[in-house]
UniProtKB/Swiss-Prot annotation:
The lineage of its organism: Bacteria, Pseudomonadati, Pseudomonadota, Gammaproteobacteria, Enterobacterales. NCBIfam families: PRK03573.1 (NF002926). It comes from Yersinia pseudotuberculosis serotype O:3 (strain YPIII). Keywords: Activator, DNA-binding, Repressor, Transcription, Transcription regulation. SMART domains: HTH_MARR. This is Transcriptional regulator SlyA. PANTHER family: TRANSCRIPTIONAL REGULATOR SLYA, TRANSCRIPTIONAL REGULATOR, MARR FAMILY. It comes from the Bacteria. GO terms for biological process: positive regulation of DNA-templated transcription; response to stress. The keyword Transcription applies. Pfam families: MarR. One of its GO terms (cellular component) is protein-DNA complex.
């Protein structure tokens, strides 16, 4: 019988994000918005749009629309990079700070609840296996 591990992992990510999405409804952020804000916040300051798109795992044109919406909401600013006038740097605004705090809080508390009843050793084993799978995939992509 063929392994369904890939489908199982994809489903896990989908339901995990859906739960966070549901809990963040009061903030009126779409999943795309909160994932983007979360990644901007955890990356080094003033990342380029290209670097952010890579971190999120989406194409840059898809990201631009989301950034336009976040800029309209006053949550980010974008400015031209001094070294490369074609590149745009992204910065969180002060207005985004309380929202980022809430998003981060929901993500952390949800993670804690989801992982409840699973030992730290089990989590470490799972993380190690996921790392190995990712390395295998990256190696296969470079062949």
């Amino acid at each position: 019988m063929e392994s369904t591990l890939g489908s199982d992992l994809a489903r896990l990510v989908r339901v995990w994000r859906a739960l966070i999405d549901h809990r963040l409804k009061p903030l009126e952020l779409t999943q795309t918005h909160w994932v983007t804000l979360y990644n901007i916040n955890r990356l080094p300051p003033e990342q380029s749009q290209i670097q952010l798109a890579k971190a999120i795992g989406i194409e840059q044109p898809s990201l631009v629309r989301t950034l336009d919406q976040l800029e309209e909401k006053g949550l980010i600013t974008r400015h031209t990079c001094a070294n490369d006038r074609r590149a745009k740097r992204i910065k969180l605004t002060e207005q985004s700070s309380p929202i980022i705090e809430q998003v981060d809080g929901v993500i952390c508390s949800t993670r804690k609840e989801i992982l409840g009843g699973i030992s730290s050793d089990e989590i470490a084993v799972l993380s190690g296996l996921i790392d190995k799978l990712e390395k295998n995939i990256i190696q296969l992509q470079t062949k």
